[in-house]
Amino acid sequence: MSLTLCTTQSETRARNHSRAKSLGTLTSAFKNQTEPIRLSSKEILEESLPCPPQEVQVTVQERTLFFHLNTIWLITVNDLKSIVAPETAFGICSALATSLTTNSSPQLVTVLSRLPHVILWNYLNVLLFDIANQRLPNSIVEDRVNKPWRPIPMGRLNEIEARRLLLGVLPVVFFASLWLGGVVETVALMVLTWMYNDLGAADEVYVVRNLVNAMGFMCYSAGSLNVAAGDYTLTPKAYTWLIVVGLIIFSTLSMQDLPDVVGDAVRGRMTAPLVHGDSIARYTIALPIFFWSVYCPWFFDASVLGYTCSVVVGGYLAFRILFNRGVANDKISWKLWCVWTMVLYGLPLMVRS
């Protein structure tokens, strides 16, 4: 079944041309800007308004089981590389390290048998956060610019359906964590999700946003390790390592804001690139990345292999951030950031014998 929504063509073209010109000007200005971007409340409001009605064909798809599964996939797919994969690696690698749990002789087969549990725990918690985040009006405005393929901008899901989905997912995630392990971390993530989304921490200045994100990543890491370790508990060094992970995230997560600056400006977010300007923001990200690339191997008394992997990947990432600029390059650097965190998470297995 198809529904046709029509407006006067002249009005539509004029408004679309104005919108395209505004966003095009913002994008062009940012490419070479070194000063913070300042948008007036009027400009933010204009860019935040939904797209004007225009002549489009909206196809109503039959909502089969595959349709719903694909919708769930689209909700979470962007965080698979940044959270699910790295945090799963954190849990497995840390559980295999003799210094991070009370298991003095972890068996590879035993730990790997818990891999599906670790993946499921991370995925469920990411699903909960993503639904809570993407249902909010500000997130929808941003996603129309940065991620138009997400379910709500695409029309696969509306705000009311997303809220009801969240109501159903909440108890599922809680009881699943009672079975899988990591229930304390799951409850902590629920609180942080509420702070980040409903209390607006995501829209505060980037320092506050990064702090909440850092605590969230610490919870993901701790939960992953608890699930992977089974009946064994964490050692004092493991808790210190979790603090280091939080500091890494706090000081480098602004990397994700570099390719999203246009959508963040429309939303009115105070990210590092928008507050300090592009050039300064890049140095505030690249320098900590290189520092952690050297510090983390030292923390674990890593072998030559550990130092080499960490310094080479981290050094190349820092170089890319400083010298390979532009949205396309920044998207590649963001993916490399995810790989870099996985390299750091693997360092407990690269210690000197």
Where are the model-predicted features located?
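Multi-pass alpha-helical membrane architecture of UbiA-family
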Residues: S2-S353
